[in-house]
């Protein structure tokens, strides 16, 4: 895979992510804020963006979504076998909820 292919894939992923974020925010804002890990301010901006603005933002060569499993405890919950899937998901949700939301600086 060459550099141009990677940039194209990143743009496509960004577009999908932004469109999904808008849909999630429109359907259930509180759940979307939690699942996306974003602030109210960022949610407001995403909801007011036009399709043209979404496409323009998506075409950057930088990923707009980020890997939220910075904490080794969260990564361990995902990678280790667990007997009770419901308990595993609850523990992961609690750990993710403790993380700060993304802010616009």
Swiss-Prot record:
Molecular function via GO: DNA binding
Pfam families: FlhD
One Gene Ontology term, aspect cellular component: cytoplasm
UniProt keywords, alphabetically: Activator, Bacterial flagellum biogenesis, Cytoplasm, Disulfide bond, DNA-binding, Plasmid, Transcription, Transcription regulation
Location of the protein in the cell: Cytoplasm
Gene3D superfamilies reported in the protein's UniProt record: Flagellar transcriptional activator FlhD
A biological process from GO: bacterial-type flagellum assembly
Protein's UniProt keywords contain DNA-binding: yes
Subunit structure, interactors included: Homodimer; disulfide-linked. Forms a heterohexamer composed of two FlhC and four FlhD subunits. Each FlhC binds a FlhD dimer, forming a heterotrimer, and a hexamer assembles by dimerization of two heterotrimers.
Family note: Belongs to the FlhD family.
Role played: Functions in complex with FlhC as a master transcriptional regulator that regulates transcription of several flagellar and non-flagellar operons by binding to their promoter region. Activates expression of class 2 flagellar genes, including fliA, which is a flagellum-specific sigma factor that turns on the class 3 genes. Also regulates genes whose products function in a variety of physiological pathways.
This protein's name: Flagellar transcriptional regulator FlhD
Organism, as annotated: Ralstonia nicotianae (strain ATCC BAA-1114 / GMI1000) (Ralstonia solanacearum)
């Amino acid at each position: 895979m060459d550099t141009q292919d990677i940039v194209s894939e990143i743009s496509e992923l960004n577009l999908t992510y932004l469109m999904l974020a808008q849909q999630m925010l429109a359907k259930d804002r509180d759940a979307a804020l939690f699942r996306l890990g974003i602030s109210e301010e960022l949610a407001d901006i995403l909801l007011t963006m036009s399709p043209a603005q979404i496409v323009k933002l998506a075409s950057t060569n930088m990923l707009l979504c980020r890997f939220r499993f910075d904490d080794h405890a969260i990564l361990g919950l995902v990678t280790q076998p667990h007997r009770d899937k419901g308990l595993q998901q609850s523990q992961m949700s609690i750990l993710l909820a403790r993380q700060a939301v993304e802010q616009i600086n």
